[in-house]
Structure formats: structure tokens, C-alpha cells
Amino acid sequence: MVPFLVLAQQCAPTVAPQTMAAIVQVESGFNPYAIGVVGGRLVRQPVSLDEAITTAQSLEAKGWNFSLGIAQVNRYNLPKYGSTYAQAFDPCKNLKMGSKILEDCYRRAIVKMPGQEQGALRAAFSCYYAGNFTGGFKTKPGSPSYVQKVVASADVTTKPIVVVPMIRKTPDAAAAVAAPVKKRQPADRNSVLVDLHPSSQSMPATGTANAPVRLKTEQPATTDAPPGKDNTDGVVVF
């Protein structure tokens, strides 16, 4: 396992690690398999890479718009970065894409707000979330705005992320004497369910790994183009 701030420094070097951590806390709670459905809701989040990929493929086939991975990159941004679903669920690759989107938002915001670093950063958060500099500041009854949530997470305690470590010729002492561990059966490649009423305040019912995605008769919500554009120069976001 790798500390998130270390991973962020390696994979998203143009964004301050604590800034990236605040966004990730709000977007996915540091869950690399998270999927956020626009106009819908998964009754539970995928618990494995296979399940996450299958769920994303099922949602795409049914015309749903969604964001995925640790930084919740919108599906329509994946072709821009040459990313597959499997790659988008990789924490490092997802952070890299998310940081480029945020970087572009910040670049455009600071042009509009010269000398206002923190103001431009908050505008960039709005851009990351809504694709513009205003949508992320809007509040809902009883709920803070997206920008307020990110700012409130500035001192979040980050979680370590599981990644494959570098091989070493000398094994760990414990590994050299450890008995083989019985492998768990892999998760079903079926995806999880979608609840079309995300406004409900009650907790979603727990789905089952072997249940296919079931959608009601409503059509997926139509949305504007996803936020973020590719960048050309190196800009550090604070």
C-alpha cells in the first residue's frame, strides 16, 4: 500500500498533493473503483476491478453518463487521454487524468482572476465538477456546495492506496517463511444495480455481486459535455 500523498506526487505532480486529496475525498472517498452515475445511483459501489469494468460497460451500453475512478473522471474524457475503463480504474492513471483536468481549469481561472490564487483555485474546483466557474458554488437545501465540500476537506486524513509494489530480489523475512494463503474466489464479472432516484436520503439497499444491472424504464439523464480539457504547458495548481 502506498500513502495517497506519495502517489499523488508521483502521478499528479502539477497539482499540490493535499489539493488533489481534498478533491478525491469528495469525489470518491479514496475508492479507486467508484462510479458516479449522472441522474442515477448505484445501490452499492463495485468491490473489484472486474466488477467495476463490467458495471461501466453496462452503463455505457444503456446510454448512461457517469464518472469513474478515484478522481471521478467523466467517461467522455477517456478517449482524450487514450484510456480504457481498466486503465481509468488504476489509481495512478486516474489521478493523472484528473490532475490534467483540474490544471486546465485552474489555468483558465487564473487568467480571469489574476493575482487571486485561492479564488482561482476555488473556481477551478467548480470547473472540475460542473464544467464552468459557477455551478460548483451552488448549494442545495441542507447541503453545502461542491466547492465548500472540497475546501472543508483541505485537511483530510488520506488513506493508503493499494498498488503493485516493485519487485526485490530479496524477499521479506515474513514472506520467506509464510505458509501459502488460500485464494479467495474472484468476484463475479456481473455489475451492480442502479437506483434511478438519487434524491432519496435513505441508504441504498445492498446489491448482490451476481445480479446484473437492472434499469427502470426512464431514459438516462441528458447532460452537457463533461468538464475539463487537455493542457499544453506545465502549471502547478496549489
UniProtKB/Swiss-Prot annotation:
Residues 198-209 have a biased composition (Polar residues). It comes from the Bacteria. InterPro entries: Lysozyme-like_dom_sf, Transglycosylase_SLT_dom_1. Residues 197-238 are annotated as: Disordered. Keywords: Virulence. The keyword Iron does not apply. Pfam families: SLT. Belongs to the virb1 family. Transcription is turned on at the beginning of the stationary phase of vegetative growth. The virB operon is essential for intracellular survival and is not involved in the invasion process. Constitutes a major determinant of virulence in mice. This is Type IV secretion system protein virB1. It comes from Brucella abortus (strain 2308).
